[in-house]
Amino acid sequence: MHIRGTMSRVPTLASFEVRYKKSFGHKFRDFIALCGHYCSPIKKYIFPNFIAVHYFYTIVLTLITSILLYPVKNIRYIDALFLAAGAVTQGGLNTVDVNNLTLYQQIILYIICCISTPIAVHSCLAFVRLYWFERYFDGIRDSSRLNFKMRRTKTILERELTARTMTKSKTGGTQRVSRPGKSDKRDDFQEKLFNGEMVNRDEQDSVHSSHNSRDSNSNANTNSSNNNSINHNGSSGSLDDYVREDKADEVEKYHGNKSYSSVGSSSNTATDENISQKLKPSSLRFDESQNKRKRTGAPSEKFAKRRGSRDITPEDMYRSIMMLQGEHEGTAEDEGPPLVIGSPTDGTRNMDNGSESKSAPTMNESKIRIQDKGAKISLDQDSVLHSSNSSACTSDEDSLPTNFGGTTPSLSAKPRESSSGPIAFTEGENADRKQGPSIQFNITKPPRKASKSKRVSTMDDLNPRSIFPHQKKSSKGYIMKHLPKARRIRQQIKRRLSTGSIDKNSSSDALDRGLISGLNDDDDGNEGDNMEEYFADNESGDEDDRMQQSEPQSGSELKLKQQQQHQLQQNLHRMYKTKSFDDNRSKPVLMERSKTIDMAEARDLNELARTPDFQKMVYKNWKAHHRNKPNFKRRGWNGKMFEHGPYTSDSDHNYQDNGNNSNSIVHYAESILHRDNSHRNGSEDVSSDSNETTYPLNGNNDHSQNDANGYPTYNDEEEGYYGLHFDSDYNLDPHHALSSNASKNYLSWQPTIGRNSNFLGLTRAQKDELGGVEYRAIKLLCTILVVYYVGWHIVSFVMLVPWINLKKHYSDIVRSDGVSPTWWGFWTAMSAFNDLGLTLTPDSMMSFDKAVYPLIVMIWFIIIGNTGFPILLRCIIWIMFKLSPDLSQMRESLGFLLDHPRRCFTLLFPKAATWWLLLTLVGLNFTDWILFIILDFGSTVVKSLSKGYRVLVGLFQSVSTRTAGFSVVDLSQLHPSIQVSYMLMMYVSVLPLAISIRRTNVYEEQSLGLYGEMGGKPEDTDTEEDGDCDDEDDDNEEEESHEGGSSQRGKSKKETKKKKKRKENENPNEESTKSFIGAHLRRQLSFDLWFLFLGLFIICICERDKIKDIQRPNFNVFTILFEIVSAYGTVGLSLGYPNTNQSFSRQLTTLSKLIIIAMLIRGKNRGLPYSLDRAIILPSDRLEHIDHIEDLKLKRQARTDTDDPMTEHLKRSISDAKHRWDELKHKRSLSRSSKRSTKTN
């Protein structure tokens, strides 16, 4: 074939360009990025963190609002600035009556208040982080969607497999049990290698079994047929005997000598031990002759005599090294089966039986010879080892294996035949090998899964002389275990997956059912076992092979068997030609799954789950079977809610599929994975690890529940949106967290989570995936926040506007103040929900002290608009999580928000912190309410109201005192102690929310300046000082006790203090919750107190004349302090001044008003998080640096505690209190007993 010397570069297809049109959002993001680029110096030095930005936003918005209010010229500018500051900060203090403002000014205050509330500000921060995610992570929207589809596909597959495995484990127990006394393979190999007993690592299990069974060889063959015939029925009582007899036959075939047969029925060999370890595909072996093996009476490679470990020649060491290299050497995918070169004397190996050698059967016929019972079998080692799973190999790509007979077929290629011809099977136990050294293909055996098929026992099964049923079952089992597993089939299957050309029509189903009907023509009472044998690669075929060997066969039986095999070959050929590998059988069988995760299978599942067509197929199939079906939930093995599988009893394996395609996807994926594993793993047996311990997945024996169509249902809980996933780097530990809560469904890997949702030790790929999940969670959260904020505004005025228009008495009061009732409803609803505290009526809410409905409605909106917002937000997300569709993208994002809220939003807390916040709010409001009822229930200010109204007024005032600032009674007329309590409540109003924000910070320890191993370092010095003082006190008390003669009392005190010290020193590395809460409180006090007293000091200087004026007794220092605390707490409550409707601030000078404005702005920033908070840091290199520091810090710690510290501290306190109470009771009992004894004496 001539090749041109030059090549043309002219393209065959004309290139064309499609210009990308940017959307409005993309252009807007580009504009923001351009502005940020030019303003980067300002952003870096003037706005280094969120707190600085918040200060700038508050001050600028206050100035803009004042500028918008002043042009009307009906108020002074200082009053406009004061009103603007009150609206921006929700302070609620007014120096003018709001009803005297124009509608324009009222609308400005309305809008400014709505865009400056804490909910609005933090929601804007969430939108900024969402934008920054899209700019920082390239293509995060598409990658997060693809990762979600991959996780969903893997979850569906693993749920199916796990449900079936759990069902089988409940009915049949564990699959593999590790027996005590088993030695490690590596240690056993090294010991026998240097003792001179064995060199080949692959033979260690068989030799180990043979050494343990030398004394029971005489009973092995006699017990074989009986045990096989009994265990063939699946009897649990004789299952171990059957497995041991199976191993005995394999070892006998392996060594070709009865003296090396395996243990009999009385052996204690473990049921899960594989006797014959298969040779590696890369190994090259020379077989020894049969006569030499009989003379030596030892395995193929063994030293002539036992010798010490020091008598090792270089040849022995070289051979051992080569063997170790072969042990770990992998096989490439394109490599074929390895060659096994037998010795020239193997041709005379089988001459003892006196039978003639038979020629290999052709492709259209099969000759089978069954050896007489008790006859000696001596075949090639690899042909025996891999006889049960040998696959046919032909040169034609479309050809199929057409010969399926005999118990131990060995695939051999004759030297004199052409390499292009087909390679025939050598049947019978006496193959002619006189031509010389034979070259054999070592067909690797796929992993063998233990099978526990349960069938109804019949007399035919129990009769060892019933030959024909076993022959039929053996042929079918042998056929199903020899389906084509070549590389070209895998490639065709993968090509079908990638192109989405999977045949799901009824024709393929009919063809598949036709095939299975052909397989089940001769029923022997175990329908569906063939499918299980094919997919699970169980050991039932070996059992049938032995049963075939136990009885002779006549010519008619052989002829009938050949006809059956020919018919099966045609069915298989049709199935292979149509590429119908779906498992849509009429009677699918529950496959037995291993409790361990194969790493190679996990990698295949990861690749398969990323295929788009396979994802669509799996999800469409799953969705079709979960539409409009009830969920039956039940407590499972780990205490969690999980859904049981579709199998309700042991005998219900052959359930009716009703034409559904529910399990076909799982069978399809399993069949691909099993075929891939058979070639990838070579001769490695996954279940052959003798030291592997399998734990039962379910301790109870409750029958599972299923839906109407027999399909398993699932439902996830809030605290565990769980699912089982494959991870190539994941090692299943028996004591791993998977036993109690599985890997999170929003991640494809098992995360290591530290304190406050801090993910540790992430790789770049894991960070990208976690960033995608966090991005989608923030995106959903932004939608929820907008609906929450706008929706509750709408609900609030919808509830108040109709009421004020229907109540003529109250509408007349509003009209008398010059305000429309409808506008009053809108304004009051906004003021209550945003905690502004300003009303359009000059006396606040005093005119509505008997209006029950608006007071109750306003109580609700005051709470959910400020301190109760995090509680209600988490409740809404939890309800949405419960109602969201299973395996949906929304459910995944909601689950992430519930598990890791502080990574996404500053005002969304974990479950424990939310409960603590709720208890704190209820406790504070209840305390104020009780104090009002106790101290002012009979005062003159509420004497005109009935008792019921007094209780309601007290409740409304206690709720408004902490946040809103509405007044339903004249506060100056209340009891002085109530005024003091209200002032304290105004100061601590924001503390529960602020402490919750800061103690749930992901970087809480770094924000407090703690970089060591102990979290309680701020109080370590105090502890040491206290300890020194205790030592001094102990010494002094001891001296006094000796001087005063009361040494016993001093010793008891000393012992109790030593016990306290011992308790403190028991857990030196334990994080101190009190130190964290104390550090937060100390920081807050250091932030607040000096500024409060500085403002009070300046105002007292400015108002000294008014304070000293005797004619103005209400102008005093306490009233000024009450006003300052109200402004600093952004509450808006005021004691007022006699004969005025405005706040007390109206009586202050201009400079004092500026101090109050500064208090409002400073107090607005009290509830903000620290500058080092993950929820306010944008994705950048700085964030990665902080994460790196956190990883290094947590790696030095002995453990990471993910429990809520406040809850743990409360539990420890309660346990300590109980312990002290028990000690006190014990001491009292001892003292009483001593007194009684003294009285009796």
Swiss-Prot record:
The chain crosses the membrane at residues 49-70, 78-98, 107-127, 784-806, 819-840, 844-864, 868-888, 904-924, 929-949, 977-997, 1084-1104, 1117-1137. Residues 520-545, 1021-1041 have a biased composition (Acidic residues). GO terms for biological process: intracellular potassium ion homeostasis; potassium ion import across plasma membrane. The keyword Ion transport applies. Residues 162-241, 253-316, 329-570, 677-714, 1011-1073, 1222-1241 are annotated as: Disordered. One of its GO terms (molecular function) is high-affinity potassium ion transmembrane transporter activity. Keywords: Glycoprotein, Ion transport, Membrane, Potassium, Potassium transport, Transmembrane, Transmembrane helix, Transport. The keyword Glycoprotein applies. Disulfide bonds: none annotated. It is a multi-pass membrane protein. Residues 181-191, 199-214, 366-375 have a biased composition (Basic and acidic residues). Residues 215-238, 561-570 have a biased composition (Low complexity). Belongs to the TrkH potassium transport family. This protein is required for high-affinity potassium transport. This is High-affinity potassium transport protein.
